[in-house]
Amino acid sequence: MNFRNLAIWLVIVAVLGGVFVVSQNSRTKSSSEISYSQLLKDVDAGKIKSAEIAGQTVLAKTADNKTLTVNAPMNSEELVNRMVAKNADVKFKSGSISFLAILVQLLPILLVVGVWLFLMRQMQGGAKGAMGFGKSKARLLTENKNRITFEDVAGVDEAKEELQEVVDFLKDPAKFQRLGGKIPKGALLVGPPGTGKTLIARAVAGEAGVPFFTISGSDFVEMFVGVGASRVRDMFEQAKKNAPCIIFIDEIDAVGRHRGAGLGGGNDEREQTLNQLLVEMDGFEANEGIILIAATNRPDVLDPALLRPGRFDRQVVVPNPDVAGREKIIRVHMKNVPLAADVDVKTLARGTPGFSGADLANLVNEAALMAARKNRRMVTMQDFEQAKDKVMMGAERRSMAMNEEEKKLTAYHEGGHAIVALNVPLADPVHKATIVPRGRALGMVMQLPEGDRYSMKYQQMTSRLAIMMGGRVAEEIIFGKENITSGASSDIKAATDLARNMVTRWGYSDILGTVAYGDNQDEVFLGHSVARTQNVSEETARLIDSEVKRLVQYGLDEARRILTDKIDDLHTLGKALLEYETLSGEEIADILKGIPPKREEEEAATAVIAPSLVPLSPGAGASVTA
């Protein structure tokens, strides 16, 4: 609320109230009001010296100079005759009403009107007018000092190329039109969260040189029926006035979800908004010169009519970057960061598989904050490594008190994961093992792939099952079955999920064959899920459970076989983890060869733990596989 406006209205109310009080007091103090019959008695008694008559109001003055006010009948001849008979001085005055009297009479009305105007102005400030709910909330971006260009976008070359063509079309349409090409009507940016979809759209705004409107998908639907469709119409009306132009809708899945997916009857405001959007994009009336760019990380929930050519002519995939893309992105975010000589961008890029652009931006920022916290003038490689740990696993919880028994359980649990990972085929190299609590995990083993991976082999999956079971088996072998902890709960869940996917999605079961089962498990529409039936019989469901159990049991048996054969290595690694708390992959290999790790006491206290892709266990230990 605007404090200045509120203060003005309070002053006005106070002034009007003061005028009313003063007028009432002046009337009270200036005269005493008596009845008409009392006035007649005073006249007959000779107490009235003079009188002034104005309409029905009589101001009579007594012999002792008191003023009496009387409301008399109109044209009261009897009163005048009696006064004349008693030699009273009688004057007649025209019945005019003073401005103050008028103001006092109008005061209640003025107060009501003032309050109404005040409320209306407040509504106008928040919603572009008292009836401004149907107005578009799209903002027109203008060039400023924070202008983003394609130079600020890295690691998504294909997406940049697609949208660069749109920008070129707006700048020089004749280049394309001479060959019969038409300007694309829309481009849909699709990709996981944090890959830079909105950043690319901002770069288009900076490069295009045409008006750029931006709005969120959630800005369309409000509490009133019909507001969403009205805002869509208003948005395109604004765009037509500024054509050629670009409209960017962020998170379009908020308004563009599949129609007919809800339960129950009644009007669906979101569907009405979507229908209006479909008509405006490619309906009876063409909107020439308006390009619509939208972003979503849920293309599977969008309505098919929204995705067809003529509305969104292009679907631009913005994936997580590969190692080369990560290197470019890191360099972009390092532009304003003073770096020490030991910082190796290529190593950082190789050590961050699966990171999105937002993750990498956060990584660089966390490293800079850590260096500033230590009063350094430059950011070192150690800061980046520690920042990776914080981004992926949370901050260290060195203050957490663990007794010796819990530490020993955790050390052997993590040692079991690491020993199995070193002895199964096609496993990713062990990068780090730690028993320092981080986040919800009391310890972790991290495996880092040697390169980006886009698919997995059957043997890699079975090896991963064995690695996941390694921690629980190690606890059983070292401490006995009766002392197994709940620390492997998330290991068991992750192994079960992997085995179920192997059976139901990837066809790794000879009994069930290469058939996809339970294809509606990820159904995002409640209405569709209720309407559809499960596509597996009870017998097939039992077979699926049986095959899942068989695969998990295979991983358990394989882990038991390896740890039984490598029991000496398990004891060696468990004791080393208790002593050093954090070990790198190279140090683990040296320890198993009988070579103690070579590091200073300071380095041991600030040992760096490399990140992992999937932390599995929040309990007494976690196995992380990449």
Swiss-Prot record:
One of its GO terms (molecular function) is metalloendopeptidase activity. Signal peptide: none annotated. It is found in: Cell inner membrane. Induction: By heat shock at 40 degrees Celsius. Its cofactor is Zn(2+). Residues 27-98 are periplasmic. It comes from the Bacteria. Its main location: membrane. Residues 1-5, 120-626 are cytoplasmic. GO terms for biological process: cell division; protein catabolic process; proteolysis. The active site is at E414. GO terms for cellular component: plasma membrane. Coiled coil: none annotated. ATP binds at G191, P192, P193, G194, T195, G196, K197, T198. The chain crosses the membrane at residues 6-26, 99-119. Zn(2+) binds at H413, H417, D491. Homohexamer. In the central section; belongs to the AAA ATPase family. In the C-terminal section; belongs to the peptidase M41 family. NCBIfam families: FtsH_fam (TIGR01241). Acts as a processive, ATP-dependent zinc metallopeptidase for both cytoplasmic and membrane proteins. Plays a role in the quality control of integral membrane proteins. This is ATP-dependent zinc metalloprotease FtsH. The lineage of its organism: Bacteria, Pseudomonadati, Pseudomonadota, Alphaproteobacteria, Caulobacterales.
